[in-house]
Amino acid sequence: GIKLPNNIGEFELILEEKMKDQCCRALERLSQEGLINLDTVTGECSCRPEAAVMSRQMVQFNSMIVILALSPLCSLKELFRELSACAELQVVLKRDDKKILNEHAKHMEYPFKSSEKVKTDQDKSYVLLQLVPDRVKLVENMVKEQEYVAHGACRLLSAVIELAIESQSGGLL
């Protein structure tokens, strides 16, 4: 059988202290990113509107940081670039996808620079994101990936819009 240490109470105290430390660090990070108000003296915290938007739209923490860092007057090209950088929108780039995506990339609203090609998962998401409004027919395996990117982008864009309305600023108003 399993032998438990004689000092199980001490083990529980150490575990509790580690959990408390992790929670405090997480709260400090949320506060630093502007998602909560945290009183470090009392430990009291309250949700900011940004956190409510994040929760409502089910936006991942790292994606929310990207959204909060957007310039209030960012261009659509910048918006596409930044959203495609969000891990929750990225799909795996396969070797067979590159030729098809590079061909479509030439005709996008916001194409790559002439020397740039699709090389990363972020590049693939950037292309797929721009092909959604044009309803471009893709090969079967990429259709599901494009739908995945489109659904995720809708959530993220809804968060961007809610934040713009909340702050009464931004190019989306």
In which residue ranges do the predicted regions lie?
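Short helix-coil junctions and helix-kink-helix linkers
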Residues: 1-21
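C-terminal helical accessory/scaffold domains
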Residues: 24-37, 41-173
